[in-house]
Structures are given as structure tokens and as C-alpha cells.
Amino acid sequence: MADGRVLAVAGAKGGVGKTTTAVNLGVALADAGETVAIVEMDLAMANIVDFLQFEPERTLHDVLAGTVTTTKALYAVEERLHVLPAGTELSDFNAINVAALAPVVRSLRPAYDWIILDTAAGVSPETIYPLRLADEVLIVSTPRVASIRDAKKTIELAERVNGTVGGVVFVRAGTGQAPPPERLSGFLGADLIGSVPDDPAVAEAQDMSQPVTAYDPDSPAAEAYGRIADSLILSAPDSDEEGDGIIGTGGVTDLKNAEEIAETAAEADPDNLDGSTRPLEADELDTTEEGEGGFEFVKRKGDTQ
């Protein structure tokens, strides 16, 4: 199996739909036959559990602390989709070295077709570093003016740290007096990967702590995420080709924390990876089964129980 593709889902501010997009793309890619791991990279304000209705016993923070292996912190959403959540307690954030994320991400590449990094908002080391780890950065934005400006800043940030911007996805599209997504992506100087219409099914699904792609797969938003997933699959390089990924290389320049990030990256990414982050093989994944700490979607639209 060729190494998987690492995709960072990013946006400058919270509330633009990063986690919604990361989770729904994960489900859509899995439904298309791909194997997917979603890694929650918001180490301070984790919330992916609210989208998937489960309480993890082990998290990415435990992996970074060296107390559990990566496989023990992966949870099965579906047969082809696993999630590595971050800790939800603020105390979990203490003494976390973001550069230690590199070997964790690298260890997942042999076992999955896609590794989706659900990044944090803002400009901080935990935001910057995932942009360096990804083969491509997927920018998420609404069509509102303030969101577009923030998306422009995120693109500039990704480019300054040698990230590769794969394109932009617009969510809650078709509202207000905003120009069409094609014009907005042109303004941003990024390829348009797709747009997700403003759809009440998304809010309904979130109220049920589920992705809309699972809750109402025939909704306009779910179908849009499906098309975006298809586009990503078609644009991925052949398995025999070298990707454009920059994992472990980076090139932070002219940033406040650049020197510190570069130094900690070198310290945290040794050639002899420890047991918690060694490369995994697909057939050795020891994720918790559904019903034993794993989880399954508990309700779909139209269910009466």
C-alpha cells in the first residue's frame, strides 16, 4: 500500500466550518472506498467529539505524552474511517510539544489512503505546524467578506511556511449578495475544490452530534461533500508517483515562533521513532471495535427511535 495523502483543513478563525468539513469529507471519502484517519489538531480547544457523540478514554495528548500508542487512541467511526481525537480538558494542553506531531502523522501514512488534519484557528505553533506536515492545505471559508479576508491570510500563512495550498472549499454558499464561488476563489488565487450550499440539514445533523453525510446522505450539503471527496480522489497522484508533500521539511520564515518551531521539530523527529509513533501497517491497526469504546452513528434523519 502506498503512503497516504495528508490533507490539512484550515481556516483563520473558528466557526467557518473547518471541523464540519473535515468530518464530512472523512465520511464521504470512506463511503467512496478510501481508508481515512482524521487527526484533531486543535490541541487547546478540541471539539470533534461533539460532532461524533463519543467520549474517548485515550487521546492525541496521551500519544504525544508517550503514555499510549497511536493505535490505542484511534477510534472506529466506520470500517474505513478512524478518528484520533485531541483531549477536551485544558489541562491536557500543558507541556505539549507541537513538533512531536510529525512522527505521529508519519506513522499513519502507510495505513491509510487519507490522513485529514483538523487544524486549530488563529496563528500559533499548533496552527502553523500542521500546515507544514500536510501534502496539501484545504482552505475552508464562507462567502462572507470577513471570512474571505481571513482565508486570504490563511493562504499567505500556509505559503510562508512552505505549505502547499491545494484549493478552497466554500461552505454556506448561495446566501446573501456574495459573488459566486468561482469569482471568490479567483480573488483568493486558489483553485475552487467545491462549494457546500447553506442547508438546514447541516444544523440538524450537528444537533444530533453527527456528520450530515451520515445523518442525511441525500441532502444537498451531503451530496456536495461527496462531490468534493470525488474531486480529491481524482486529483490525488498515482500511487507510484512521489507526491508534493513536504512532511518533515517545512521552511518557516519571518514568523514570530519560527526559530523555536524549527528547533523543536528537529528534536522531536528523530530517525529512530519510538514505539508510540513508529510506522503502522494497515493489517496491524488495533482500533477499538464499535460497542467497546468505539462508536456508531446513533440516529439518521427519519428515524423514530
Language model features by range: what are they?
Residues M1-V16, A22-T35, F54, V63, ...:
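Haloarchaeal acidic low-complexity proteome signature biased toward cell-envelope/secretome components but also
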Residues A12, T142-P143, G166-Q177, S195-V202, ...:
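G-domain G4 guanine-recognition motif of GTPases
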Residues L184-D216:
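Beta-strand-loop-alpha "switch" segments that mediate conformational coupling across diverse proteins
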Residues S107-W114, A121-V145:
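Inter-motif core of Ras-like GTPase G domains
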Residues G11, I38-P110, A205-D207, P211:
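P-loop/Walker-type NTP enzyme "switch/lid" segment
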